[in-house]
């Protein structure tokens, strides 16, 4: 084999190696294979196992200009604080036994993101009598939009009510379920009237301007136990002044996990059934 033939074979070999390597963008990150992801490459599998949902929610809401209570609840304008008088903020139960909640989803979302949102909604099917259905002409409905943050009204507002799921930070099934639970009328677990028997609020570790987010409410606990594993429970460092300075500590066992990442707990499901009298 002459020298020219050897050089040609060597060049073909090197080109084959180059084509087998992953393509990288300008920042050096691999591109191309995103098997199992939605159209935007965002799915629940992307989640960092060490980041809880409330941390993601509060981080996403840092840049919002929406007036929020407790980090992700739209401040009410048509009723007293966080109270729901005479069940006025609960969704109505139909004669067929289902609580039908109409919704529309903004065209801002990709098909993959719509699938993620509707998949989180379907988590209620089969385990509760709650059914999220696409709106036809119903007066009361949820409008899912991508604004700056992840947030919701508390319960049924009446008419159109926005539920924001920012495309950049809220496209996780657990976050979507968290906000849907707010829309059903559920508050954060650590604001329960009996919370002081189960968690200690470390006021000295909380950003002073955010301390009001830890106020207790006169809640209806539906005869269910305090649930450390609830998807509605803050993580232990929510609104903390510094990393490692926990704002919430479980008691008596400080090592009990809170601020989970896996979706609705058994008691979250039970409360939906009790609140809406599911059979």
Swiss-Prot record:
Q: Which PROSITE patterns match?
A: ASTACIN, ZINC_PROTEASE
Q: Which residues bind Zn(2+)?
A: 178, 182, 188
* Pfam families noted in UniProt: Astacin
Which chemical reaction does it catalyze? Hydrolysis of the inner layer of fish egg envelope. Also hydrolysis of casein and small molecule substrates such as succinyl-Leu-Leu-Val-Tyr-|-7-(4-methyl)coumarylamide
What does the UniProt keyword field contain?
Answer: Cytoplasmic vesicle, Disulfide bond, Glycoprotein, Hydrolase, Metal-binding, Metalloprotease, Protease, Signal, Zinc, Zymogen
State the active site.
179
MF terms from GO for this chain are: metalloendopeptidase activity; zinc ion binding
Chief subcellular location: other
Q: Give the signal peptide range.
A: 1-20
Q: What is this protein called?
A: High choriolytic enzyme 2
Task: From the UniProt record, report the name of the gene that encodes this protein.
Answer: hceb
